[in-house]
A protein has these predicted regions:
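Active-site-proximal alpha-helix that buttresses catalytic centers in soluble enzyme cores
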Residues: 8-69, 96
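Phosphate-handling substructures
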Residues: 66-115
Length: 115
């Protein structure tokens, strides 16, 4: 028995365009994100599979625009909590915190944003 597995990233949000960290902030897709997704089609191999999305609006909107039929949300797929850094630009945080920011980023999934 074989399993099918695919990962799709949500469409573009205004915060993506502005370079802001989204984290768990429930930012919707931008107009550009909705338009770009409207020209995307999921390969037929994946038409009849179950799709699981983050509960965040941008992920649910993406699934709806792509016309994914069998969808459900799962809280375990929600974005990392970026705490006080949500809504801020990563480039600004790097300038502001210098070496300590780079060290924190180098921790990968163990990175600890404040708040």
């Amino acid at each position: 028995m074989s399993s099918k597995f695919a990962i799709l990233r949500h469409g573009i949000t205004n915060w993506n365009l502005e370079g802001k960290i989204q984290g768990r902030t429930d930012v919707p897709l931008s107009k550009a994100g909705r338009i770009s997704l409207s020209s995307v089609s999921v390969p037929s191999l994946f038409h009849d599979v179950e799709w699981i999305t983050s509960p965040l609006q941008r992920a649910r909107e993406t699934a709806k625009i792509l016309d994914l039929k069998k969808t459900r949300t799962d809280i375990r797929l929600i974005e990392m909590n970026w705490g006080e850094w949500e809504g801020k630009k990563l480039k600004d945080l790097r300038e502001q915190h210098g070496v300590s920011m780079r060290e924190n980023e180098n921790r990968g999934l163990d990175m600890q944003p404040p708040g």
